[in-house]
Amino acid sequence: MSDIQQDSTSTTLGGTSLGGTSLGGTSLGGTSLGGTSLGGTSLGGTSLGGSTTTSTTTPKSTNSKNKKKKQTSSNNNNNNNNNNNNNNENNRDNDAGSSNKSFMPLNNNEDEGTKDYKQGGYHPVRRNDVYGNRYQVVDKLGWGHFSTVWLCNDKDTPITTSSSSSSTTTTTTSSSSNGNGNGNGGNVIGYKQVALKIVRSARTYSETAEDEIKILNAISKYNAQDKCVARLLDHFTHRGPNGRHYCMVFELLGNNLLDLIKHHRYRGMPITLVKTLMKQTLIALDYIHTKCKIIHTDLKPENVLLEKSFDFFTSNDYIWSEKYGYFKNRTSSSNKQSQQQQQPQQQQSQQNINDYSDDSDDSHSDYSDSEDELKNKGNKKSSNRDRDNNKNKNIKKDDNKSSVNEINNISKENTDNKDLNSSEENKKEEEQQQNKKEEPTTTTTTATATATTTTTTGTEEFKFVNGISYKFKKNNELFNENHYPRAQLVDLGNACWTDKHFTDDIQTRQYRAPEAIVKAKWGTPVDIWSAACMAFELATGDHLFKPKSGKGFEKSDDHLALMIELLGKPPRFIFAGGDESRVYFTHKGDLRKIPDLSDQWPLFSVLTEKYKFSIQEAKDFEAFLLPMLNYLPEKRATAKDCLNHTWLKDVPPFLN
């Protein structure tokens, strides 16, 4: 595989996801839009693991405004015609009133810019362009360093009304070879929508895309439909003016788990919900580890998506009930307008996985202290600083009321470091989320900057088009027939094989395993470590490990210090067995740059003292997490071990 990492689409904006990235309530990398499931059926005769085909549709000139009327009549007679000339402009369907508007970007911070629309770069896309003879462009979803992503209608999968009934119920059918694509004879009222990722055409990007497709095909090969893993629907190549581009088609999903964390105002979810989501995540990990022989390498809340779209930006409008799942809280409707005004219009953040730079390797769900505070920190153990600050947080843990818990006694240090961009939030919201906010440093790159400065060891940040979210249906329910939300693991762009690693720079900072930090031998257990970190975050709203750099030490030093404080001194495998162990440890196993680690704060104490878990809750949760946090990868619990743990015994069996 090329040194360039594949698209990491984990940036959240509004709730729609692109292979793990959220925007406006719809998602790429999973299964459903508005509750319509694609299931495991092969679409339009295209096998999920089928061979690559080539489309040679050439995009139109941007000066084609006057051709629209002429094309409309012609194209309506040629929809999905197998004899279409791929080089003809008429290989697209123009609905009445549609626009052939160019999506070429401007040179500003709101899009990817025009400089990389050249040989080896992005492919120019226009509304109503058709790719692979079936995917018609509707709108732009987002972009990153490696690719652009587009919302498309799948013209081979129309949604029809029954011709024998006046019922308004719609059915999704694979089209026959007739021109209208309505094989059942009903009236076509729409088309299944998918997300199309078009990769830049340079060889390095193409090689990375080939690796990703192989991994995604392996997942689809073993019938992943019930394994809580998102699947690739289709892939092909397209030749345009800038070269040959790999194109990947994904299903549409809902919000990611980071949105759910935000919905609960970073105070933790009901433990029953945490168990449900973790069981599905572990089902997915067990499947890819044991059956597919794949390591995800970037498990985090942003990369687990719900199957239904959900509007989390009016947080108090929806509350959790074990009996009913999420339902509309009618008593809060009078406060809806004020709540919306208090929420930021867009909680845009940045994703920097696999980047070992201290300024940019954080998950975008992480918010650290301001740059000024970091400059004032001395060479002392940051975990003690975190403890002093966070003990004042005094979160009351209640299984059924965690979405309305109050946070008291925020320390003055925390309130002095408010995000400068939080003017739209009220003071209480700022205090509640202070430990999650980060003022970007001057070295943090935007998506536009990444497109020009990211090296071959970087990964992709996605930015999203404003105003897309209104197009997607918002469901008022987030549960299935058993009242529990369904979720899927997404974003295999950084995955690798168990016997073939593409890079050792893996995992987002907060979820990174110790063996990955010291560059020791690693495998599937790195995903289990990340799963433990994610479970803690879902239950508490905070990261289990939130390292910071300071005077005389880097984030990796602090990260290891936090692990030692929680789990004790690491074994020789960690302090001496990695290629970079000596960078962080002495020959005796002490940290070089943070030697004073006399205090311990074990997990049970963290749960009871800081998050106010009951004694029994803390014991049970600790018993589940600690085997997943074993320093030694070979002794760490497997996904199957975790699924068999008593902590998950009360999760509904339908998830199996």
Curated annotation (Swiss-Prot):
Residues 96-108 have a biased composition (Polar residues). Keywords: ATP-binding, Kinase, Nucleotide-binding, Serine/threonine-protein kinase, Transferase. Its EC number is 2.7.11.1. Residues 49-64, 72-89, 160-179, 332-355, 441-454 have a biased composition (Low complexity). SUPFAM superfamilies: Protein kinase-like (PK-like). The keyword Transmembrane helix does not apply. ATP binds at L141, G142, W143, G144, H145, F146, S147, T148, V149, K197. It holds the Pfam family Pkinase. It comes from the Eukaryota. GO terms for cellular component: cytoplasm; nucleus. One of its GO terms (biological process) is spliceosomal complex assembly. One of its GO terms (molecular function) is protein serine/threonine kinase activity. Coiled coil: none annotated. It catalyses: L-seryl-[protein] + ATP = O-phospho-L-seryl-[protein] + ADP + H(+); L-threonyl-[protein] + ATP = O-phospho-L-threonyl-[protein] + ADP + H(+). Residues 16-48 have a biased composition (Gly residues). The active site is at D298. The keyword Kinase applies. Residues 135-648 form the Protein kinase domain. Residues 383-401, 413-440 have a biased composition (Basic and acidic residues). Belongs to the protein kinase superfamily. CMGC Ser/Thr protein kinase family. This is Probable serine/threonine-protein kinase sky1. It comes from Dictyostelium discoideum.
